[in-house]
Every structure is written in C-alpha cells, then in structure tokens.
Regions:
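Contiguous, often N-terminal, cationic amphipathic patches that form binding interfaces
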Residues: 1-86
C-alpha cells in the first residue's frame, strides 16, 4: 500500500497536542485497511524517524485512528511542525 494512501491527516485537538508534548506521540487518521506494520513503515519512510510503537482504534463512525509513539531520539513536535500543525 502506498504510504501517502495510508496516512490521511493528523488530528488537531488539545488532547493530541498534549500527547505530542508529553508522550512524544503523533495522532493520525489512517486508512481503514492499514495494518500497524504498514502505518509504522509509512511514518518511517515519509518522515525519516524511528517508530517505537503503534496503537490503533476504529471509531464508532468507522474511521481508523493511529497513536504513533516515536523513539526518544526523534521529536514528535518537529514532525508535527513538518506536517503543518504548528
């Protein structure tokens, strides 16, 4: 699956900004059929970072959300600014 089709867009809320600052996590809308492994590979390829962990959930509306924990060497705030969140 194409990395640009896996990652749809980042989430922008107060809770998401707290996760970026405190836990070094990004929160993203992703393709419904994307696996955790595909999400990890897409983030690593598109943003040149090391991903520690990916947690996913499917919302009641039928969309998929991914919580991506970056390694300690990479800064989630830097990636968020590259995505245009800051």
């Amino acid at each position: 699956m194409d990395p640009y089709k896996i990652i749809k867009k980042p989430l922008i809320s107060e809770k998401d900004f707290e996760l970026i600052e405190k836990e070094n996590k990004l929160v993203l809308w992703v393709a419904l059929k994307a696996t955790k492994k595909q999400i990890k590979e897409a983030i690593e390829l598109l943003y040149n970072v090391k991903v520690d962990k990916v947690n996913t959930l499917i919302t009641p509306k039928g969309t998929k959300k991914a919580y991506v924990r970056l390694s300690d060497f990479d800064d989630a705030a830097d990636i968020a600014s590259r995505m245009g969140l800051f």
